[in-house]
Amino acid sequence: MVLAASVVQEVANVPFAHEVAGLVQPVAEAQNVLGLIPMSHGLILAGILFAIGLCGVMVRRNFLFMLMSLEIMMNAAALAFVVAGSRWVDPDGQIMFIFILTLAAAEAAIGLAILLRFYHQRGHLDVDSANEMKG
């Protein structure tokens, strides 16, 4: 009976703040690790990658290079989601990355199938000739 009373006394002496600090400490450590790269730098990198991909889509006329530029643009958007999610220690950014990665894989598969069909019909990958009709 004395042992049970001493255990109850020790539990009563532990302040609630120590329990909260034990739960908050891993979150603070995660913020320190993820905070090595500022959010602005990550978003600037994502913006630069998106601009490179956009220039590639607008300038290049080869269908394969246009698909690669589109992939760069999708990866830039995924990077922006991951950076934003890591800023607030929220897994939503990583979940969106998985969705974008899945979408990019489907886009690549369909795009390459269209590319092969286009190449077998035309013999080249110039998209400017796609509006010319056979006749």
From Swiss-Prot:
GO terms for molecular function: NADH:ubiquinone reductase (non-electrogenic) activity; quinone binding. The chain crosses the membrane at residues 33-53, 63-83, 95-115. It holds the Pfam family Oxidored_q2. The keyword Transmembrane helix applies. It is found in: Cell inner membrane. Its EC number is 7.1.1.-. It catalyses: a quinone + NADH + 5 H(+)(in) = a quinol + NAD(+) + 4 H(+)(out). Gene3D superfamilies: 1.10.287.3510. The keyword Manganese does not apply. InterPro entries: NADH_UbQ_OxRdtase_chain4L/K (IPR001133), NUOK/Mnh_C1-like (IPR039428). GO terms for biological process: ATP synthesis coupled electron transport. One of its GO terms (cellular component) is plasma membrane. Keywords: Cell inner membrane, Cell membrane, Membrane, NAD, Quinone, Translocase, Transmembrane, Transmembrane helix, Transport, Ubiquinone. Its main location: membrane. It comes from the Bacteria. It is a multi-pass membrane protein. Belongs to the complex I subunit 4L family. NDH-1 is composed of 14 different subunits. Subunits NuoA, H, J, K, L, M, N constitute the membrane sector of the complex. PANTHER family: NADH-UBIQUINONE OXIDOREDUCTASE CHAIN 4L (PTHR11434:SF16), NADH-UBIQUINONE OXIDOREDUCTASE SUBUNIT ND4L (PTHR11434). NDH-1 shuttles electrons from NADH, via FMN and iron-sulfur (Fe-S) centers, to quinones in the respiratory chain. The immediate electron acceptor for the enzyme in this species is believed to be ubiquinone. Couples the redox reaction to proton translocation (for every two electrons transferred, four hydrogen ions are translocated across the cytoplasmic membrane), and thus conserves the redox energy in a proton gradient. This is NADH-quinone oxidoreductase subunit K. It comes from Psychrobacter cryohalolentis (strain ATCC BAA-1226 / DSM 17306 / VKM B-2378 / K5).
